[in-house]
């Protein structure tokens, strides 16, 4: 005869992998066209001059140049721009 009651099973114990989001290149860096600058969920950073925005809100360089992060406007939005040299 069993001396302990049967332990119930749990429905937890799973988790998803990290999605590798975040800033990939920082202000002042020289980057080439097509380089991914920021991977994000939603527009935490907004595209400025010579920066494109993908379907998943990924920011990427449209031209080669120096990377610039700045806050602009009444709402102090974080803009990512490229200064073409």
UniProtKB/Swiss-Prot annotation:
One term of GO molecular function: structural constituent of ribosome
Residues in coiled coil: none
Cited Gene3D superfamilies: 2.40.50.100
Keyword Transcription in record: no
Keywords for this protein: Ribonucleoprotein, Ribosomal protein
Alphabetical GO biological process terms: translation
SUPFAM superfamilies: Ribosomal L27 protein-like (SSF110324)
Cited InterPro entries: Ribosomal_bL27 (IPR001684), Ribosomal_bL27_CS (IPR018261)
Homology family: Belongs to the bacterial ribosomal protein bL27 family.
Protein name: Large ribosomal subunit protein bL27
Record organism: Blochmanniella floridana
Native organism taxonomy: Bacteria, Pseudomonadati, Pseudomonadota, Gammaproteobacteria, Enterobacterales
């Amino acid at each position: 005869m069993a001396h302990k009651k049967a332990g119930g099973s749990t429905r937890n114990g799973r988790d998803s992998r990290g999605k590798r989001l975040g800033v990939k290149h920082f202000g002042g860096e020289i980057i080439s066209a097509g380089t991914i600058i920021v991977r994000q969920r939603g527009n935490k950073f907004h595209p400025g001059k010579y920066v494109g925005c993908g379907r998943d809100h990924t920011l990427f360089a449209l031209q080669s140049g120096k990377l610039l992060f700045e806050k602009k406007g009444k709402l102090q939005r974080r803009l990512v721009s490229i200064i073409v040299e």
